[in-house]
């Protein structure tokens, strides 16, 4: 049974398994220009409204990203997303399991009306620390969020993409780039199906 008490996004789970790197100690610096998105236009406060509610999810995670590895592991589980502040924020809980273990993660997404951008941050049950955020938004049904972080001591760009959004389903992908965003390697793919009540 899905828990509506605790708030998700599969990325928090990715962090829990080490495929989403933590930002460096220089987290106060802004992302590299190649990792940034341009300015947003229009009101995007309700971009994530489609995700409110309970979902089942199937996801695949690439082991050892940016090493040439083609080894993937699968997970299945649930996600529950709760709206806050009339859509200006939301919090979600992800709980999935598979051969590589269990992922329990919490996502916090906050909307900044002055920039018309969202910031996505994560915590996981392993250490409870809140990560620096990826910044972005939606355009023409596609959500894209970027950040610059480090992986094994080298700077990388991180990209989240939400796509194929309908009332009852959507797709999420995470990708890393070691060349300032010229090429991307996908390392996390998840599909979501709404739990009808």
Predicted regions and their residues:
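N-terminal secretory signal peptides that target proteins for export/translocation
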Residues: 1-4
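Bacterial N-terminal signal peptides
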Residues: 7-18
